[in-house]
């Protein structure tokens, strides 16, 4: 795990998706737990469970599968703001992904939330990544 935990989460999920694995294990931190809750609520993953091994906590994510197929859905995840170049947006300029089908994950003063929640509360923040 590197210094950019959000990029690591995206990479873990993307690699598991490309390898056609049903589950992926990621290290558990406050940021990863908040992001995983949003992904679960938005329907991009099926299930989450906590796992403890050698005094380290992990989250085991079950990726969403298509009916009657063993392959997972192809989720496109794209990191936007990164440690070397932070990208911020106010509530009016939060981008819409694929006409509202995709989700923008933001870090705001009120925690990590989706673009829809941020628009409703009329707050902006750092654009972490897109998923669609």
From Swiss-Prot:
GO terms for molecular function: rRNA binding; structural constituent of ribosome. Its main location: plastid. It comes from the Eukaryota. GO terms for biological process: translation. One of its GO terms (cellular component) is ribonucleoprotein complex. Pfam families: Ribosomal_S8. InterPro entries: Ribosomal_uS8, Ribosomal_uS8_CS, Ribosomal_uS8_sf. Part of the 30S ribosomal subunit. HAMAP family: Ribosomal_uS8_B. PANTHER family: 40S RIBOSOMAL PROTEIN S15A. One of the primary rRNA binding proteins, it binds directly to 16S rRNA central domain where it helps coordinate assembly of the platform of the 30S subunit. This is Small ribosomal subunit protein uS8c. The gene is rps8.
């Amino acid at each position: 795990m590197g210094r950019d935990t959000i990029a690591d989460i995206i990479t873990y999920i993307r690699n598991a998706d490309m390898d056609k694995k049903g589950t992926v294990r990621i290290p558990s931190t406050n940021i990863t737990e908040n992001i995983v809750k949003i992904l679960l609520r938005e329907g991009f993953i099926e299930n989450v469970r906590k796992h403890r091994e050698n005094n380290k906590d992990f989250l085991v994510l079950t990726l969403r599968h298509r009916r009657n197929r063993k392959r997972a859905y192809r989720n496109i995840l794209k990191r936007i703001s990164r440690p070397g170049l932070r990208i911020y947006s106010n509530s009016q300029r939060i981008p819409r992904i694929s006409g509202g089908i995709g989700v923008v994950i933001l870090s705001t003063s009120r925690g990590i939330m989706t673009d829809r929640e941020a628009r409703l509360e009329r707050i902006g923040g750092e654009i972490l990544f897109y998923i669609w």
